[in-house]
């Protein structure tokens, strides 16, 4: 199924939703680099192709979220540290105190009160 391009005026409204920030990680976005994420996947969950179902996203967040619902995305992010534990480089840098793990709940940029 070929997707229709999202018109520029709609892309601009999506970009402005969170003042030029990724809805998920909160990084600043350039309009030209912003990806439009479907909050509810059109492909799997019959999500709508309209602005209410769009979030501005950076390439990394949009790629990793893929077609996941928000809560599944949050759960997958929460598993990243344990997945990293399997790599030698991660264990070595942790052993030498070069990185530090911080356990905290995953709160997306769009969920923080001052960004709404």
For every predicted segment, state its role:
Residues 1-9, 27-29, 52-55, 63-116:
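Extended charged
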Residues 6-34, 58:
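Short cysteine-rich loop/turn motifs with clustered Cys
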Residues 12-16, 45-53:
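Immediate flanking context of iron-sulfur cluster ligation sites
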Residues 35-41:
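Histidine-centered catalytic micro-motifs used for acid/base chemistry in nuclease
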Residues 38, 54-57:
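Glycine-/proline-rich flexible loop or hinge segments
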Residues 44, 62-63:
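Alpha-solenoid HEAT/Armadillo repeat architecture
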């Amino acid at each position: 199924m070929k997707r229709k391009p999202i018109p520029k005026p709609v892309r601009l409204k999506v970009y402005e939703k969170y003042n030029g920030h990724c809805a998920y990680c909160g990084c600043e976005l350039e309009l030209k680099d912003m990806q439009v994420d479907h909050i509810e996947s059109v492909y799997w969950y019959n999500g709508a192709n309209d602005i209410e179902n769009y979030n501005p996203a950076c390439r990394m967040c949009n790629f990793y979220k893929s077609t996941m619902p928000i809560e599944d995305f949050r759960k997958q992010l929460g598993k990243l540290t344990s997945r990293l534990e399997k790599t030698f480089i991660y264990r070595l840098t942790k052993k030498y105190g070069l990185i530090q793990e911080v356990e905290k709940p995953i709160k997306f940029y769009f969920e923080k009160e001052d960004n709404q």
